[in-house]
Amino acid sequence: MTNPTSDGQPRGRLRVLVLGSTGSIGTQALQVIAANPDRFEVVGLAAGGANLDTLLRQRAETGVTNVAVADEHAARRAGDIPFCGPEAATRLVEETEADVVLNALVGALGLRPTLAALESGARLALANKESLIAGGPLVLAAAAPGQIVPVDSEHSALAQCLRGGTGDEVAKLVLTASGGPFRGWTAEELEHVTPEQAGAHPTWSMGPMNTLNSASLVNKGLELIETHLLFGIPYDRIEVVVHPQSIVHSMVTFVDGSTLAQASPPDMRLPISLALGWPHRVPGAAACCDFSTASSWEFEPLDNEVFPAVELARHAGQAGGCMTAIYNAANEEAAAAFLAGRVSFGAIVETIADVLHAADQWAPKFSETPANVDDVLDAQRWARQRAQRAVAQARPATASAKTPGVV
């Protein structure tokens, strides 16, 4: 690892390995790195292969030779790809010397690369929340204190605010949620949502899966679980509040009644830069709030009846074991079915609820702490199969969308 100088600044450039380089987080991370050549250098890239032209352009721009592509056909088309196949990203991590591994892969397939990064001793800049949620106890056991630095804006905000007090001074953590594009809609109106509508987030620019998860509030459920795992605060002391402007990213309330909040315009380059350079800040990483003009910041309670995903996540987290992996796997199956037009938007969370209920009733072993990665994968396979059955029985998607208030 790079050693700090006497003034607390990093000595030399940090070597960064970017997993998921062609996605939203990965491309923005490369922008941050390119803008700060005195601080960072890219030593490897990994991607699925769906955006092969983007990956090849990134390889040319960074000059790296260590590249991993999961899709073997895409790797053959690209030529000269040293790591290919389902385990390509994991092998890349194992065979590349890096100070920081940014895991921006999508889905629970990021678990093995996450564990490999922790095993290597590199700092893990974690955007792939699913690997922490699925791996839970395994990931925490593999991590040294402070080795995982979150990339999500909410958890980056919490990490910054928690500097303002000791652990025993924390009363509660407050996650903010924009409410997504369907804030204020009824459950009946949500039945008519189309994938196009669900893909239009009001404040953030994200990848398609994160955008859909934000619309269903599943993303906030995943972030609730991630908050507990990262900071060790019990679930009953983690709140979620709707903040439509997405300026305040999270808050920490302390035992004396004071609350610290982190505020900045919605721009992922800020938490990305902080995760890459932690604990040092990168000057000019993103724009700051402009207090010279009038503005309003609103906060309101989350409607858990219309959007039950957060409370389902709380239940899964409190149950422990592999239940959070089951929550995530069920969502991935149901979300894919919605995007394919096979089920309604509301069926996503209904499927998660069905799978969690079945796990509670028929598979109590899933609440036990997993002994290894295979235990997690077994739980995920069971959850996917159960979710597929639920999807097959769910209400089909409606043909057209409705806007609230329009008959």
Swiss-Prot record:
Catalytic activity: 2-C-methyl-D-erythritol 4-phosphate + NADP(+) = 1-deoxy-D-xylulose 5-phosphate + NADPH + H(+)
Keywords annotated in UniProt: Isoprene biosynthesis, Manganese, Metal-binding, NADP, Oxidoreductase
Tagged with keyword Transit peptide: no
GO biological process: isopentenyl diphosphate biosynthetic process, methylerythritol 4-phosphate pathway involved in terpenoid biosynthetic process
Leading EC class: oxidoreductase
EC number(s) stated in the UniProt entry for this protein: 1.1.1.267
Residues holding NADPH: T22, G23, S24, I25, G48, N51, N128, E130, G207
GO-annotated molecular function: 1-deoxy-D-xylulose-5-phosphate reductoisomerase activity; manganese ion binding; NADPH binding
Annotated residues for binding of Mn(2+): D152, E154, E223
InterPro entries in UniProt: DXP_reductoisomerase, DXP_reductoisomerase_C, DXP_reductoisomerase_N, DXPR_C, DXPR_C_sf, NAD(P)-bd_dom_sf
Entry cofactors: Mg(2+); Mn(2+)
Pfam families from the UniProt entry: DXP_redisom_C (PF08436), DXP_reductoisom (PF02670), DXPR_C (PF13288)
Pathway per the UniProt entry: Isoprenoid biosynthesis; isopentenyl diphosphate biosynthesis via DXP pathway; isopentenyl diphosphate from 1-deoxy-D-xylulose 5-phosphate: step 1/6
Residues that, per the record, bind 1-deoxy-D-xylulose 5-phosphate: K129, S153, E154, S178, H201, S214, N219, K220, E223
PANTHER family for this protein: 1-DEOXY-D-XYLULOSE 5-PHOSPHATE REDUCTOISOMERASE, 1-DEOXY-D-XYLULOSE 5-PHOSPHATE REDUCTOISOMERASE, CHLOROPLASTIC
Function noted in UniProt: Catalyzes the NADPH-dependent rearrangement and reduction of 1-deoxy-D-xylulose-5-phosphate (DXP) to 2-C-methyl-D-erythritol 4-phosphate (MEP).
NCBIfam families with a match to the protein in the record: Dxr
Xref: HAMAP family: DXP_reductoisom
Family: Belongs to the DXR family.
Name of the protein in its database record: 1-deoxy-D-xylulose 5-phosphate reductoisomerase
Classification of source organism: Bacteria, Bacillati, Actinomycetota, Actinomycetes, Mycobacteriales
